[in-house]
C-alpha cells in the first residue's frame, strides 16, 4: 500500500470517499497507485500471475482490458483466483465500445471504467458534416441516459465503483460538433455522464481527463475540478498522462503532468503509463508521491498563474519571448563544478555538453551556456567554453532569494541583462510568489534548480514535476541546473525532455507509445525501439506507436503520424486523425512509415540533421 497519507492541514482538493472493493479513495485517504495488465484477459493464468507481481510491487489497484463478453466472463475466474490466493487487490474492467460487456463484468469486477466518447456513440473523427440542432442534441442526451442508466443502476445496486475516463482524442461526435477538440469539450463530455449518475443518486464515481500532451491534460483536470467544485460535486480524480512512452522520456512526460497536479492538491489515484512491463510503473508512482508530499503537507495555496481555460492556455503558450542574451528560446544553463573543468580535457567536456570538438557542430540538446566557479573563470578550459557558450560566474549576476527582497528593486537588478532566482523549498510555491511579486522587475529570469541527486530517475521526476509546473504556467526565461552528482549528458536529457513535454521548446522527436494491454497486437517495446532508432533525428515531429485500433486513434490525438496495430500481423498508418494506409503486413510497415514521412516532406536523412544523440 502507498504510505503517503493526508496531513491534517493538507492542501489536497476535498473529495468524497469512494469504495473500490476493499479499498477507499478520496481526500480522507492516501493517494493510491494503479497499473494495467499487458496479458490477454482470457489467459487467466498469465493475468493472475501479472496481477500478483503488481501486488508484490505494492500496486494498489489493477485494471484489465475487457473487449467483449469472453473477457468479461474471464474476470469472474480472475477474481476467484485472486481471492483464493488471498489477494484483495481491487480489479477494474476497462470498457470501450461495448456496453453489454460492461453490464456483465459489473458482476465480477470492483470497478468499471468507461470512455464517454465511445460508450454510447461510435467514435467519429470530426469532419464538420453533421449538424446537431438544439432539439437533436437534447434527443441525443436522452439516448445517452437511456443507454447509460442501466449500468449506473447495476453498479449502485451491487456497490461497485465506476470511472468516467475522458480521452482527449476520442470525444463523441456530439461533443465534437458542439465544442470541437477542446478542453471545454473534454469537460462537457464528463459532465454529461455524471449528470446521469447524480440524477440516480450514484456517487461511487472517479473521473480522469487524459491526454498524451501534458499541457492539455493539466488544463483539463484543472478545469474539471473547478467546474465540479462549483456544482458541489466532490468527485475523486484519477491522474494519468496517456501513452507516456518508454524509459526516462516516459517518466518525464508523466511527471510534468501528474506531478504538477499532485503539487496543486489534485488527484486521489495515479498511474504512469509507461511502455513495457507494468511493474516498472509503480516505483515511478511512488517516487512522484514522495516528491510532491512537501506540497500536500502545506495549507492550501492558490496558483495565481493557473491556466483555467483553454483560451488562456493557448495564449499563454504563445506568449511573446523577452529579448535575452540567449535569443528567443527558453534557455538551458548548467552549473559546472571544479571536477568538470579539471577531470576532462576540453574536447571531452565539449562532447559531454553536446558539441562536436572537431566540426564545432552542436546537438539540438546543447545548452545555451554554463556557470563556472569564480576561481576558474580564467582557466584555459573556460576560454575554450567561451568559444561555444555564454559563460558566467555567479558574482556577475544578481542572485535573488525570497529572503533578500530589499535588493529586488536595486540599481544592480535594474541594470542587469538578467537575474538568477534561487528558490528554496517548496520550490514551486517560492517561485510563483517571486513572479507574483514581480521580484524580477521584468528582467529575463533564470530559475536556479539545485539538488544533490545520485539517481537519474529521481532527478527526472523532481525536475519534471517542480520545474515543469512553472513551465506550464509560462514562468521564467531559462533554467540553471545545479546537479553536481549526475553526468552532464543525463542532466541535459532531463532538462530538454522537460522543456519538450511542457511544450516550451521542441528539440527532439516525440513518441506517443501506449503501455501495452490485452488488446496489443505486436511487441510494442521492440517496435517502438526500432522506430525510435530510425526517426530520432527529426526534432519536433510526433509519432504515435499504438498497439491496437481500440485506443490507438483516440489516444494519439496530438500525433503527426500514427503506427497502429489493426489486427494480428497488420498495421494501419495515420496522418493526424486519418488512416491513409491500411492492413500493411508488419514486416513492411516500418519501411512504409518512412515512405509516408518522405511523401509528406518531413523526412531528412540522418546525416542532414547531424544530431548528437
Swiss-Prot record:
GO terms for biological process: isopentenyl diphosphate biosynthetic process, methylerythritol 4-phosphate pathway; terpenoid biosynthetic process. Its cofactor is [4Fe-4S] cluster. Pfam families: GcpE (PF04551). [4Fe-4S] cluster binds at residues 514, 517, 548, 555. It catalyses: (2E)-4-hydroxy-3-methylbut-2-enyl diphosphate + oxidized [flavodoxin] + H2O + 2 H(+) = 2-C-methyl-D-erythritol 2,4-cyclic diphosphate + reduced [flavodoxin]. The keyword Oxidoreductase applies. Belongs to the IspG family. Converts 2C-methyl-D-erythritol 2,4-cyclodiphosphate (ME-2,4cPP) into 1-hydroxy-2-methyl-2-(E)-butenyl 4-diphosphate. This is 4-hydroxy-3-methylbut-2-en-1-yl diphosphate synthase (flavodoxin). The gene is ispG.
